[in-house]
């Protein structure tokens, strides 16, 4: 169990799964830069991040910007939305002070793009589900994404594999945070979409040393 002082931002687990160096630059050195993708994501979340907004649509209720945390993972953050689905079975349900009955909580994340080929988004969603499980002593079987580009909802099963990835990522994040060491860059196709590319300088790794990088890129 991690203490309150040791908690890390849950949203960082997506950055970490995408690239450990990107996560460390953001969370250890407070580096940030914008690109088209980050700006589009912010615009989408302007319509989501209202903690006082509650929506009842049919049988289910949507809560916005819900605070969540896990001492076991050492992560805290805010879920874009939690959908409360009515249930006649009290198993794995929660109660809400304003809405009588038993409710199955489903974490929902809003993303501006479309489903990715890797599981970086799913890992973040699984971490949110695991926070809810710890907070309410329940089992959360699935979560969902709403992707702005395709205007479509995608449900995701919170599998044992995703849970293992979350635990391993959280453990590694805490180890790096304690060491204060920035991981080396690992250049790949993912670098092209990273807003920190000009700060990270992944090309340096291809040069072997700083002198070679300066000769090939700055002093030529």
Language-model features, listed with the residues they occupy:
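Non-catalytic alpha-helical scaffolds and adjoining flexible linkers that form interface surfaces
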Residues: 4, 135-137, 179, 202, ...
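Nucleic-acid nuclease catalytic cores
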Residues: 77, 83-180, 192, 196-198
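Short, charged low-complexity intrinsically disordered segments located at boundaries
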Residues: 44-47, 53-58, 155-163, 195-207
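Short, intrinsically disordered, charge-biased short linear motifs at domain edges
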Residues: 3-6, 172-188
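Metal-dependent nuclease catalytic cores that hydrolyze phosphodiester bonds in DNA/RNA
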Residues: 1-107, 207, 216-220
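Cysteine-cluster motifs in flexible loop/terminal segments that predominantly coordinate metals
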Residues: 19, 181-220
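Alpha-helical structural motif
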Residues: 9, 16, 20, 124, ...
